[in-house]
Amino acid sequence: MGPGLAASHVSFPDSLLAKMRDLLQYVACFFAFFSAGFLVVATWTDCWMVNADDSLEVSTKCRGLWWECVTNAFDGIRTCDEYDSILAEHSLKLVVTRALMITADILAGFGFITLLLGLDCVKFLPDEPYIKVRISFVAGTTLLIAGAPGIIGSVWYAVDVYVERSSLVLHNIFLGIQYKFGWSCWLGMAGSLGCFLAGAILTCCLYLFKDVGPERSYPYSTRKAYSTTAVSMPRSHAIPRTQTAKMYAVDTRV
């Protein structure tokens, strides 16, 4: 009764910590899903720059990484013009932001798919929990890396828009239209921060639970059972030899 009670006290914290680890994986999966979606939507939408409220325009003009759209304020008609070929000359801000956001999209998508394979509810390597934890760790590292180009591209674009507008105001130059960064830029920042958060959960928090669960107890119990058997065998043979030796010693004395 004593050993069984002790075993129940030992297994209860392990099961609780294992549930906490699974919960962290699901929370990270939630953030990774929406972060990857935000990055993809931000890359392929047209509202990275939008005309400010103090502009003398009767229409809303948005500029994205690939095209520019104008929406008439009276009838709501929307027209879009694509930029020139990707091989044409573009501003450094546009080219670098494109490259950074596409890189972030690919890495975030790969990290999310990898994380799905590491979840316990997914029937992938069900008998290898240690490998699944490793897969989740790789997914977290990938998401951390994905957040870097995303946040660099989004913040650089936003800062460039702000500096351009501030320079015009500082020099009293008014062109009739002024831009501010739009919701696509905000979406890129949010997606990048979400990737950082998901990656931090998977790498830092799961590291604290790396010794919890069946991936730890199974090898240890196997080694313990093997060592107990190996030790008990010599003892069982040692008892008859010792008694025989004592009897032989008594006979010789007599």
Curated annotation (Swiss-Prot):
Subcellular location: Cell junction, Tight junction; Cell membrane
Tissue occurrence: Expressed preferentially in kidney.
Gene Ontology cellular component terms for the protein in this record: bicellular tight junction; plasma membrane; tight junction
Transmembrane segment boundaries: 23-43, 99-119, 135-155, 189-209
A single BP term in Gene Ontology: paracellular transport
Primary localization: other
Membrane topology, as annotated: Multi-pass membrane protein
Catalysis: reaction(s): Mg(2+)(in) = Mg(2+)(out); Ca(2+)(in) = Ca(2+)(out); Na(+)(in) = Na(+)(out); K(+)(in) = K(+)(out)
Keywords on record: Cell junction, Cell membrane, Ion transport, Magnesium, Membrane, Tight junction, Transmembrane, Transmembrane helix, Transport
InterPro entries assigned to the protein according to its UniProt record, in alphabetical order: Claudin, Claudin16, Claudin_CS, PMP22/EMP/MP20/Claudin
Short sequence motif Interaction with TJP1: positions: 252-254
Residue ranges that the UniProt entry lists as topological domain Extracellular: 44-98, 156-188
Keyword Membrane tagged: yes
GO MF annotation terms: identical protein binding; paracellular tight junction channel activity; PDZ domain binding; structural molecule activity
Family, similarity comment: Belongs to the claudin family.
Related illness: Defects in CLDN16 are a cause of an autosomal recessive chronic interstitial nephritis with diffuse zonal fibrosis (CINF). CINF is characterized by increased blood urea nitrogen, creatinine, and urinary proteins, leads to lethality before puberty, usually within the first 6 months or year of life.
Domain remarks in the Swiss-Prot or TrEMBL record: The first extracellular loop contains negatively charged amino acids that affect cation selectivity.
Oligomeric form and interacting partners: Can form heteropolymeric tight junction strands with other claudins. Interacts with CLDN19. Interacts (via PDZ-binding motif TRV) with TJP1 (via PDZ domain). Cannot form tight junction strands on its own.
Function: Forms paracellular channels: coassembles with CLDN19 into tight junction strands with cation-selective channels through the strands, conveying epithelial permeability in a process known as paracellular tight junction permeability. Involved in the maintenance of ion gradients along the nephron. In the thick ascending limb (TAL) of Henle's loop, facilitates sodium paracellular permeability from the interstitial compartment to the lumen, contributing to the lumen-positive transepithelial potential that drives paracellular magnesium and calcium reabsorption.
Entry-linked PANTHER family: CLAUDIN
Protein name: Claudin-16
Organism: Bos taurus (Bovine)
